[in-house]
């Protein structure tokens, strides 16, 4: 029996029998069309926002913005942290800070030797477990706008903390909005009077952080804490001369 075009349609009303592939489409093609339609709708929503956003320049990470990063490592210390509790990292009261199990002070002199303008100040915390094969995460809580006369507790209970970032390193930006740091030779102030360096030089222009760290372990853990301050310095001149030769 040959092909008869009239056989494509059933004699029963409301039903259709399709013989050729002219009206058929694969399910993958249908889903692809739906996805493209959603993409076009999403692009149409963002077009006016993108036109405005293109007028501004921002950095992906403020830490990687313009300027030179100068690190000063304050101390390394081993602390014992109990389960479900968090310990204060640094109380900013003189060079003793919070000495516990073992403490080593790193930077004896300030690494910046000339008058500089500080753009940003970062509090960097590096945490490491002291015993191998320990499966727990580091937790953290901090406050920036505490009253200067507030006396922080050494130990607090964990309540809704967040996990420390990748590689167990966390950075906190201490910059105050609307406060410009003056040109200062920080090395002389740091070396002359370390105890008053923070209260007289840093905290009037930057936040004084109260940082607590803990673990998710159910046992008492010994952790290594390394505390550093990262100064982002505005570079007025390059570190190396632009020209070399007998005339310079």
UniProtKB/Swiss-Prot annotation:
The keyword Chaperone does not apply. Keywords: Viral occlusion body. GO terms for cellular component: viral occlusion body. One of its GO terms (molecular function) is structural molecule activity. The keyword Transit peptide does not apply. It holds the Pfam family Polyhedrin. It comes from the Viruses. Component of the virus occlusion bodies, which are large proteinaceous structures, that protect the virus from the outside environment for extended periods until they are ingested by insect larvae. Belongs to the polyhedrin family. This is Granulin. It comes from Cryptophlebia leucotreta granulosis virus (ClGV).
